[in-house]
Amino acid sequence: MHSALIIFSAVAALLSGACSSADSPSGRSNPSGLAHIHGMGLDSDGVLYAGTHYGVYRLARERNPELVGDVVHDFMGFTVVGPNHFMGSGHPGADSDDTPPNLGLIESTDGGQTWHSLSMTGEADFHSLDYRHGLVFGLDSGTRSVMVTADKKTWYRRAEISAVDIAVSPTDPNGVLATTGTGLLRSVDQAKTFTPVADTPPLILLSWPDEGPLIGITPTGMVYASQDAGTTWQARRDLGERPQAVEAAGRGLVFVATDRGIHRSTDNGTTFEAFYTFDA
């Protein structure tokens, strides 16, 4: 357990740092900037988007990644909430003049071409964002607290936990899971309080699709799935690489970004193929 905590802490530090193998080798190489991914989301047209240290990238199958728009923020948090509708957080790009160091909650309604501020500018740096049931859940790295808003403007501060990732139940707005260095935590009161979940693997990243199993990944790249909201877990596939982000899109589709590339599964993480391969 002690060694697992050390590995968890090391990977967590990499995931939170602002500067900072699959079955098939057919993935394409990436342009500069894509190799540090903080969040992914699948748009309604089936195209994968990734929020990175150097902006948002569009990753269409059989095409090279494309930087979207002219805004090159450091996206520490990124999620797709609807067709061409994204939310993000992090730090402003080098070309952003007179902008506070923390972006708070920002939003794009044109597929990432432009972004505008919604709230918490200069105050919050959300390293995990989840949109469920008309609510935005954010994990603020500065205060180590989960925050919730119903109107994207007025935020309510909930439990303070040393978490790396959070995931909200697609069926219960009160059900929230969080990964920590001491194990998986569960909330049944919309992140006001958390309790440990017994006998779970040392998960660091989570993704909870509208349909299909909850997906979790360990710091060493072992993919797990849960059919009962995180109570029990089944090992699926060992990628053997350090994970950066995961997106479980439902209908068996799972994307995992690691330090070596992006992997794609069509069977809920049982097998994977290379989607994109990062330059060495």
Question: Which residue ranges define each predicted feature?
Answer:
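Hydrophobic helical h-region of N-terminal Sec-dependent signal peptides
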Residues: 9-11
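Extracellular glycan-interacting surfaces
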Residues: 2-5, 15-280
